[in-house]
Amino acid sequence: MTAEKIHAGIAVAMKLFAERGWEADVGLIRPDESAVPTVERQLASKSYDCVVIGAGVRLPPRGLALFEAVINAVHKAAPGAAIAFNTRPDDSADAAARWLPA
């Protein structure tokens, strides 16, 4: 998937979050040592009911350590938030809907 397709999918997801009446933020991370501090800063900025973690973090086998680090950072920084997983950028609202009240 190209960066262009990812950003287009994120734009669709943000529209779908808004249509459901939910406030949403995008927190992009790099696949390096800056990922965990970036997640921690984002989650410290306010309270979240759900955090959706995209396939770009979850799926590459070489990214398993990054995935574990991100999950643990979310768990520590937002212990009350549900954790959801999308299958593509534009279904993030559906992923959150599985865990958030209608």
Which residues make up each language-model segment?
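Catalytic-face loop-and-helix region of soluble metabolic enzyme cores
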Residues: 27, 62, 82
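Structural motif
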Residues: 32-40, 93
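Glycine- and acidic-residue-enriched helix-capping/strand-helix junction motifs
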Residues: 1-9
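Mid-chain, well-packed structural core segment of small domains
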Residues: 37-75
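Short, well-structured hydrophobic secondary-structure segments
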Residues: 9-29
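Short beta->alpha junction loops
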Residues: 25-34, 86-89
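Ser/Thr/Gly-rich flexible loops in soluble cytosolic domains mediating phosphotransfer, phosphorylation
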Residues: 9, 69-102
